Amino acid sequence: MLKFFLGLFFFIVYLLHPPLGFAFDKSDPSVSLLQNRISNNFTRNYCKDINNGFSKDEAMKSAIVKTENIISFSYNPQKKWIEKDDLANQISLQVVNDCGWSFGLIGKEGVDYFKSYFLEIYEKTTPDKNFSR
């Protein structure tokens, strides 16, 4: 009988004071689609330039400028919600998976290296711009 009342007591306390839950921001599908488009465009340009014999720096700058030009003229209002770090992650994963082997980038180390390299060159190439703004 004691177990029953003790169980009932804890059940009532649980109902009166439920545990806190932490919710994540729900991602807007149109933001994800735009981010995918940007990432695909950058990766396609970068890998094409690498395969055409450009240096890493030349290919990076060229792909950034081409992608930035497309984004600048985009009227999609969702572009302001794209996080630069998320986009850099996605681009890094895609580049390493698509053509990273051709210049020695493989696995997580390759993705991390390319991400930091991308962000560094991006800041130098477009200091007053932001992919997503």
Regions found by a protein language model. Name each.
Residues M1-F4:
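Positively charged n-region of N-terminal signal peptides that target proteins for export
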Residues L6-L15:
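Hydrophobic helical h-region of N-terminal Sec-dependent signal peptides
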Residues F9-F10, F42, Y122:
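Enrichment for repetitive, rod-forming helical segments
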Residues G21-D57:
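Immediate post-signal-peptide N-terminus of mature secreted/exported proteins
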Residues S62-R133:
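Compact alpha-helical subdomains of small soluble proteins
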